[in-house]
């Protein structure tokens, strides 16, 4: 049952949630998903999930016991041989069924996201849709799992390769995209023939639970996808479990580097997408209205809690004169609960996050920046008076040494820097340690081409503020924003979840009717 008052209509849409307990003693708690069953945890430690717009309790998440985590990994390990041997065509049909169920239930998933994460309903639907795109691409995974063949490398000798699944894989997901990031991970992994253990963010568990419920309805066999809950203990268990072959992670810097170090030390593949400081470069010849609209949406949408949010704007030359108009646009944005009519920004995830954002805003002011739009005391409707709200905030005259520039704020705060030339903008951005995304706004093809060639950032938008690639490409954040063995989804995503087996085959013509003699010499292929 949905707990927040302003979305009572959404509770009628969602209906029964198998993943929430109906037991009187475990009322309002979230289950585990192990070997095809939603299981009540035997833990004595629970974490509260509260609606960030109202502070009302939504559910309690178990800190999975060691025995429960071991059971999840065992279920995945036991299910792997049969799932690996399921034909790629049948796996694709199941993923296609899953795609259809996600599409059918998009409104329900979005309502769950808004309740637990806080983002507006339209933004929550976008969260689901961007994940759905990866599921759609996973349906056609067979075309990316084709091996290679060279015939007759030597007389009667052929070499060919197979692309095969790894085994048990795991995913650790963040709070900011409760549907999209899990859907980046386990659908592609299982489409490739792997089995999976998912640990969703303990702050937003229910979207992941509903997604695995739909996967079961789509025909995913028992044990192929499993869900555990918890914090650091669950993360370390995944990093250490010998059965787990690969780990996908999206989240904060410290956690990402810990998972990469611990996982790789245990012989696992790890892909770790971490923090960002995404810059927009505004050239004076850009289309002014479109640029300001793009900056407003990309800086303040989702309350700045996107790993690809534009959190820094670099104004070249006279384009700095556009900043007052940008502030006027930001002032008009409505801050409210995510399901409230007309809401543009919802709350940030927690009171601690709100406090940190406030501190970073103040640090900028203390270090000499000007706060031309201050969202720290934003006024919201009385029903949201307890929520974690921060309004759009703009700091100008920011310098690279300031804390508000150096750190990822992860809130609706845009820091503005001024430079004289595009070259200076490129130098400034390349000096920043992060490399997730950037955008340039210009009407000059020459400037755009120079920017895309010289900028040391993994994803570049040209007159497009949030350049997240569609899934037939890959999400290619770089430098301080990524460590690991391969990027998410696309070709590199398939490569991450698979391994290559190469076969050298020797079927000699004379073996048909004659005996075979032994040779003690080193075999040399290609000589004959």
From Swiss-Prot:
Annotated active site residues, numbered on this chain, are 307
Keywords from UniProt, A to Z, are:
Mitochondrion, NAD, Oxidoreductase, Transit peptide
Q: What is the first-listed, main subcellular location in coarse terms?
A: mitochondrion
Supply the SUPFAM superfamilies for this chain. Answer: ALDH-like
Instruction: Determine the domain of life of the protein's source.
Output: Eukaryota
Q: What is its EC number?
A: 1.2.1.27
Residues of the transit peptide: 1-26
Q: Where does NAD(+) bind?
A: 175, 199, 202-203, 408
> Which reaction does this enzyme catalyse, per its entry?
2-methyl-3-oxopropanoate + NAD(+) + CoA + H2O = propanoyl-CoA + hydrogencarbonate + NADH + H(+); 3-oxopropanoate + NAD(+) + CoA + H2O = hydrogencarbonate + acetyl-CoA + NADH + H(+)
Quaternary structure and partners: Homotetramer.
Record family assignment? Belongs to the aldehyde dehydrogenase family.
UniProt protein name: Probable methylmalonate-semialdehyde/malonate-semialdehyde dehydrogenase [acylating], mitochondrial
Question: Which species is listed as the source?
Answer: Dictyostelium discoideum (Social amoeba)
Taxonomy of origin reads: Eukaryota, Amoebozoa, Evosea, Eumycetozoa, Dictyostelia
Q: Which gene holds the coding sequence for this protein?
A: mmsdh
